[in-house]
Amino acid sequence: MDVNPTLLFLKVPAQNAISTTFPYTGDPPYSHGTGTGYTMDTVNRTHQYSEKGRWTTNTETGAPQLNPIDGPLPEDNEPSGYAQTDCVLEAMAFLEESHPGIFENSCLETMEVVQQTRVDKLTQGRQTYDWTLNRNQPAATALANTIEVFRSNGLTANESGRLIDFLKDVMESMDKEEMEITTHFQRKRRVRDNMTKKMVTQRTIGKKKQRLNKRSYLIRALTLNTMTKDAERGKLKRRAIATPGMQIRGFVYFVETLARSICEKLEQSGLPVGGNEKKAKLANVVRKMMTNSQDTELSFTITGDNTKWNENQNPRMFLAMITYITRNQPEWFRNVLSIAPIMFSNKMARLGKGYMFESKSMKLRTQIPAEMLASIDLKYFNDSTRKKIEKIRPLLIDGTASLSPGMMMGMFNMLSTVLGVSILNLGQKRYTKTTYWWDGLQSSDDFALIVNAPNHEGIQAGVDRFYRTCKLLGINMSKKKSYINRTGTFEFTSFFYRYGFVANFSMELPSFGVSGINESADMSIGVTVIKNNMINNDLGPATAQMALQLFIKDYRYTYRCHRGDTQIQTRRSFEIKKLWEQTRSKAGLLVSDGGPNLYNIRNLHIPEVCLKWELMDEDYQGRLCNPLNPFVSHKEIESVNNAVMMPAHGPAKNMEYDAVATTHSWIPKRNRSILNTSQRGILEDEQMYQKCCNLFEKFFPSSSYRRPVGISSMVEAMVSRARIDARIDFESGRIKKEEFAEIMKICSTIEELRRQK
C-alpha cells in the first residue's frame, strides 16, 4: 500500500513538523584526504575581510601580519573585520553600567581559579598539536612531552603542579636562545627473512636530539594545527578547524574561565548553560519583551545569522576587552590574561599534510608536503588551487601561514559571546534614546534579536541601528541569511520557539541505537537515551514503547543474542540455546545471554542486572558478577559511567548511565597495526605512564590523596607507604618475619638504585 507522506501531517501543527526537514538521519559526511585546501581558504578569506588594514612584520619570527583594527568604516554590506577599539570599550563600559560589579566579581572568581588549577587540567581534550613532534597527539601525551622538554631545558617551575607555574615556564621558554627537543623518527631497511627467504622491510624507531633556535621555537609555540571538521550535517563544503599547542592552551583556559564567569551573570547569554536551563533563560527574555510591548507596540524577532563570525573577530579586540575588564586588578593577573590574545595576534596556521598527486599513466602517487608549497612550480595544480597558493605564498614560513587577524573556530566562544551580548545590552531605551528598543540572545556566533517599536518604520530603524552597531565591533549580520517574524516564532541554536519551545526531535535521532561499546554499556545507554528523550524532548509513551522494542531488536541483531527459544540461527545460537536449556529461571537471563526483555517505559532507570537479579539462578549470578572471572578486564567501575554522545549539532555531550560490572563489561584490545608505526614510541610512553599510575594507585587505594608532583616524590611516597604497611601487617601477624625482611630489603634496594642514578 502506498502512503502519501502528506497524510502524516494532517493532524500535526506545522511548527511540529519542522524537525522532519533536518538532515539528521543516516550517516553524517566525513572528510577524506588533507585539510590543506580548506585551511588555505580560511587564511585567504580572513585576510580578504581585513585587507584594508595595516601590514607589519613580526620582529621575532619575520612573519607578515595584517592589523585591521580601527580600519576604514564599511561603506557597503560586505563582511569586514574593522572593529573600532573605542566602540568596543564603550560597549564594555555600558555593559558594566547595566550590571554593576559584574567584571569585578568575575575577576575575583577567576583569580581564585587561577591559583588553584592544577596542570593536569590541560590533559582534558582530544587531539592537541604536539610542538615537539610537529603533529597531533592525545592531550595527555602532548602535555607530558612538553613538560619533559621544559625540564631538560632547565625550566622547572612546573614541578609545583600548578597550571600558573607551568605557564611561567612557557613565558621563559620564549626568551631562551634555543630549545633542545627529542623527536621520534623511523629507519626502514630491507633485510632477508630467515624463514621465507624473502626480502622484508624492517622498521626501527629512533629518538634523536634536535636543537630549535629562538625563531623556530616561537613559530612552533604559536602554531595552531588544522584539520577538517568531520560529521558536519547540512553543509556542502567542509571547513577547517584548529587545535592549538600546549603553550597557548593554558592561557586560553584562564581567559575563557573569566568570560564564562561573566556569561553566567548575563541574562542574554546562551552559554555556558545548555538544555532545559537554556530554554528557560531564553523563554524569560521573550516573555519580558512580549509583556513590555504594550498593546500599542509591535514586536518582531530576527532569527540571526552572522557571516564568518570567527574570521572577522580579532584577537586585538579581545585584548582591549580584557584590558578594560581587568582594569582595577593586580598586575600579575592582567598579564596572565592578556597573553592569550597576544599569542593569537601572532598565530601561525599549520597547513596540514599537503597535497596528494597521482599520475594515472605511470601509476605513481606522491605527497607534496605543505613545506614545499612556497617553492614548488604551480603548473602541476588546477586553477583554483593555483590561485589559493599564489595568494597565500607571501604569508608562508616553514609550512605554516602567518594568520594575525581572525580567531580560529571554537577558541574564545565565551569571550566572543560577551562581545555579542554587549550589543544586545545597548538596546535598552535609555541607550537608544528613541521609541524603538531591542533585546535578544547570544550564544557564540548565533543570535536572536527581538525589536519593539510603535510602528513598522520604528522596527526597521531599530534593526538598521543594530546592524550598524555590530559592524563597528567587527560583527557582520548576514542580511541574506537572517529573517524576521512577529515575535513568538524564531529559531536559536537549533531550538525552535513557537509560543514556547517545540521539541526538535530529529536532532536526537543519531543517539538512538546500539553504541558499540560493549553489551553491558550498550544496553544501559540505549534505555537511558529513551528515558532522557521522554523527559526532555516530548517523546510520548507510545512512541517510547516502540523505540524500546526497536532498540531491543537492534541490540539482539548486533550482538547475535536472540532469545534462547527462537528459530534464528547465528554464530552464538548454539551456546545460547545450551544456556537457555540449563537455566531454571529463564526470565533471569540477560538479553545479551538470550534472555527475555523485561524493560518497559516505567523501569528504564534500573540497570538490567538489578532488574533481573532476584530472578536469576544462583550459579548464573555467580558467573555473571564474579570479579575473579579471567575473561573480564575489570576496570574499577564507578557506579556512574560517562558515554560520549554525538548529538546532531554542537559539541559531543557527556551522558551519564548506570553501570554494573559484569562479565559483559569487556574492553576491547588495542589495534595491533599501531605497533609498526612511528607512533610506537609514544604508545610505549603512554603504557609506561599507565603502569606507573596503576602501581601508584595500588599503594594508595584511597582516592582522597592529592597527587604528589615531580617524579621523585612518587617513588619515595610508595617506598615509605610500603614500609609502613609492612610494619603494620607484621605486627598484627598478617605476614611472617621472612616476608617482612624481604619487603624491607626491596625498599632499600630501590632507594639505592635511585641514589646511583
Swiss-Prot record:
GO cellular component: host cell cytoplasm; host cell nucleus
Miscellaneous section: South Carolina isolate has been sequenced from formalid fixed-lung tissues of a 21-year-old male which died in 1918 at Ft. Jackson, SC. Brevig Mission isolate has been sequenced from lung tissues of an Inuit woman buried in the permafrost in a gravesite near Brevig Mission, Alaska. This sample was recovered by John Hultin, retired pathologist.
Family matches, as PROSITE patterns: RDRP_SSRNA_NEG_SEG
Record's compositionally biased regions (Polar residues): 55-64
InterPro entries given in the database record: RNA-dir_pol_NSvirus (IPR007099), RNA_pol_PB1_influenza (IPR001407)
One Pfam family in the UniProt entry: Flu_PB1
The enzyme's E.C. designation: 2.7.7.48
BP GO terms, sorted: DNA-templated transcription; symbiont-mediated suppression of host gene expression; symbiont-mediated suppression of host mRNA transcription via inhibition of RNA polymerase II activity; viral RNA genome replication; viral transcription
Motif window: Nuclear localization signal: 187-195, 203-216
Subcellular location: Host nucleus; Host cytoplasm
Catalytic reactions of this protein: RNA(n) + a ribonucleoside 5'-triphosphate = RNA(n+1) + diphosphate
GO MF annotation list: nucleotide binding; RNA binding; RNA-directed RNA polymerase activity
The name this protein goes by in its record: RNA-directed RNA polymerase catalytic subunit
Enzyme class name: transferase
Similarity comment: Belongs to the influenza viruses polymerase PB1 family.
Post-translational modification: Phosphorylated by host PRKCA.
Record-linked HAMAP family: INFV_RDRP (MF_04065)
Keyword annotations from UniProtKB, A to Z: Eukaryotic host gene expression shutoff by virus, Eukaryotic host transcription shutoff by virus, Host cytoplasm, Host gene expression shutoff by virus, Host nucleus, Host-virus interaction, Inhibition of host RNA polymerase II by virus, Nucleotide-binding, Nucleotidyltransferase, Phosphoprotein, RNA-directed RNA polymerase, Transferase, Viral RNA replication, Viral transcription
Main localization of the protein described in the UniProt heading: host cell
Residue span of region Disordered: 53-82
Domain of life: Viruses
